[in-house]
Amino acid sequence: MAFVAPVATVRATTKSSVCQVQGRSTFAQFSGMKKVNQSSRLQPAQSGSAFGGYSDANDAFYTRVSGIVAATFGPTMKVRVAINGFGRIGRNFIRCWAGRSDSNMEVVCINDTSGVKTASHLLKYDSILGTFDADVSAGEDTISVNGKTIKIVSNRNPLQLPWKEMNIDIVVEATGVFVDAPGAGKHIEAGAKKVLITAPGKGDGIGTFVVGVNEKDYSHDKYDIVSNASCTTNCMAPFMKVLDDEFGVVRGMMTTTHSYTGDQRLLDAGHRDLRRARSAALNIVPTTTGAAKAVALVVPSLKGKLNGIALRVPTPNVSVCDVVMQVNKKTFKEEVNGALLKASEGAMKGIIKYSDEPLVSCDHRGTDESTIIDSSLTMVMGDDMIKVVAWYDNEWGYSQRVVDLGEVMARQWK
């Protein structure tokens, strides 16, 4: 099913801004289990310089994200965004977006069947993130975040949502239900122009993008429905691209040790996957994942070369990806780590983080980057078999990339 997005009305102030990329700059912080920077991959340049004194590598990343180096934008468009589904990713999205003073998106509506009071409460108080350091309040059919009013609607049928009446540009589809073109396309039938799915897309008619890897391929005219892939694909794809470019990947196997998710059962109960039917709090649960194969959607040279499984474990957040691969080029541990360190400081700064400390999962909670290389665990067997271990905050880091992809879409708005 193909959809053609109508030309959107420009709704914005008439300011112009020179934009650049910066790895991790603090815009706002929330208080919780630890202080965390809320960062934007696309940020205003420092005064006095089009590039703000940052490296050529950062400028190169800017080129990939926006398609323009040191470009002065005309009327800055605030595209109108609605969120369908206000669960873990939906609420993380709001926190990430609220921390960006330069966002070209304006969240104006949330579809949540739990109601205004619950939506407001769960946004403010979070067992993983801690209390949101923002002014959050509930009205009759709205919530307010730092003075910005967001309408709350409640309808399980996307065709009946008020996207046309509210002039919605982008729907962030965060239910995990409408992940194919016919399902996500219902938002467009209801009046939205574009759909951004916060899960792997299924079937044809959906563009898959991983920021830092292939977001330069996004085209406003070509894609009406896009997917931000999965959190695990966002972890794997950046470092697999680096290793494939540097050493030439022949084949590989991945295991992700993944925190439990809302799709599992707290206590034993029915589920289509009999392993996921067992208590998430008590078991290591082996299950399937398409994350490894999906890497090929954004790194085509890896098509048919990767596969893997997931082990769901009794932790609420932060996961770790273990990839063993055969490569063409003979190498050694220090060379592998050197390539990953170089990427983390250069072209993939803000996407790959490099760690040489003996840390555990809780230490990575709230990390903005998509992947954290645990360099002490890198191994090379013989001279052509590599093992790389990478952590990722499967909620927060992923949600940062959803916001980033939304910004990529917004900056091409017509």
Swiss-Prot record:
Homotetramer. Residues 1-76 form a transit peptide. Its EC number is 1.2.1.13. Pathway: Carbohydrate biosynthesis; Calvin cycle. It is found in: Plastid, Chloroplast. NADP(+) binds at R88, I89, D112, R156, N394. The keyword Cell division does not apply. The record marks H258 as: Activates thiol group during catalysis. The active site is at C231 (nucleophile). This is Glyceraldehyde-3-phosphate dehydrogenase, chloroplastic. InterPro entries: GlycerAld/Erythrose_P_DH (IPR020831), GlycerAld_3-P_DH_AS (IPR020830), GlycerAld_3-P_DH_cat (IPR020829), GlycerAld_3-P_DH_NAD(P)-bd (IPR020828), Glyceraldehyde-3-P_DH_1 (IPR006424), NAD(P)-bd_dom_sf (IPR036291). GO terms for molecular function: glyceraldehyde-3-phosphate dehydrogenase (NADP+) (phosphorylating) activity; NAD binding; NADP binding. Its main location: plastid. Keywords: Calvin cycle, Chloroplast, NADP, Oxidoreductase, Plastid, Transit peptide. D-glyceraldehyde 3-phosphate binds at S230, C231, T232, T261, R276, T289, G290, R312. One of its GO terms (cellular component) is chloroplast. It comes from the Eukaryota. GO terms for biological process: glucose metabolic process; reductive pentose-phosphate cycle. It catalyses: D-glyceraldehyde 3-phosphate + phosphate + NADP(+) = (2R)-3-phospho-glyceroyl phosphate + NADPH + H(+). Belongs to the glyceraldehyde-3-phosphate dehydrogenase family. CDD domains: GAPDH_I_C (cd18126), GAPDH_I_N (cd05214).
